[in-house]
C-alpha cells in the first residue's frame, strides 16, 4: 500500500531498452488487436472496478469526482523539466524543440451523459476514458510525419492496456535510442494515460518505418482518414520487452484499482452523501 501511495504522490517512470533492429512490420488500418492476458493480467482485475464505475450515472460521477479531477498539466511539467520552449503539434510549427501528439481525453472522465446501468450484463460499451484500448489510434505515429530534427518526440498515450500500445512502444524503441514512459503526479490518477518521451533518433530505422507506412497508406503525408484503430505487428514482441513494459504499467494499474475502489466505496456508502470516510481518504490521497 505504501508503494501505491508513493507512486501516486511522486509519479512513476521506466526507461525502455533500445533495439537496433525494427520488428517485422505489417500495418493494417481499421482494427486493433484483441486484449489477452499475455499483455497485462492486472488489467482484467482492474477492469472489474472500472465496470462498476461505468454503471454509475454520469451526474453522480461528476459530483463525486468534481474536487479530485484536477487539470491535467503533466505535459506542461515535462516541457518544464526538459527545458522545452517550443512544441510542434500536427505540423503547426516549422521549428520546435519537440514534436507532440496528445491522444488522451484531456480533463475528461466519460464520453457522454448517461443514466445508471442496472448490471454488468447490461453494459454494451465503455463510457469512460479509462482502460479503453480502442482509444489508441494510428495518430500515435503521426508525429513521425512531421519529425525533422526536433530533440524530442512526445506522445500522451490514452491507455497502457492491450497489445497495441506494447507493439507501438516496441517500434518506438527502435526509432529512438532513448524512450521513457512516465505517469506524472500532475496527470489524472483516475485514468490509465501516460507520457512517452523519446529522443536521440535512429535515422536509418525511422526511414525504414516511414517507407513501410507510406507504402501502405499510399501517401507521403499524413491523412486524417488514417486516424483509426490499427495493428502493425504480426508476431508478438519478445517476453523480455513485455515484462519491462508491464513493470511500469502494473504500477499504474495497481494505483488505479486502489483509487477506483475508494471512489466506488464512496459512491455506494451508506451515508448517501459525498461526505463520507472513503471520499475523505480519496481527497487526501489525490490532492
Curated annotation (Swiss-Prot):
GO terms for molecular function: mRNA 5'-cap (guanine-N7-)-methyltransferase activity. This is mRNA-capping enzyme regulatory subunit OPG124. Its main location: virion. Belongs to the orthopoxvirus mRNA-capping enzyme regulatory subunit family. InterPro entries: Poxvirus_mRNA-cap_ssu, Poxvirus_mRNA-cap_ssu_sf. Keywords: mRNA capping, mRNA processing, Transcription, Transcription regulation, Transcription termination, Virion. One of its GO terms (biological process) is DNA-templated transcription termination. It comes from the Viruses. Interacts with the catalytic subunit OPG113. One of its GO terms (cellular component) is virion component. It comes from Vaccinia virus (strain Western Reserve) (VACV). Regulatory subunit of the mRNA cap enzyme which stabilizes the catalytic subunit and enhances its methyltransferase activity through an allosteric mechanism. Heterodimeric mRNA capping enzyme catalyzes the linkage of a N7-methyl-guanosine moiety to the first transcribed nucleotide (cap 0 structure), whereas the methyltransferase OPG102 is responsible for a second methylation at the 2'-O position of the ribose (cap 1 structure). Also involved in early viral gene transcription termination and intermediate viral gene transcription initiation. It is found in: Virion.
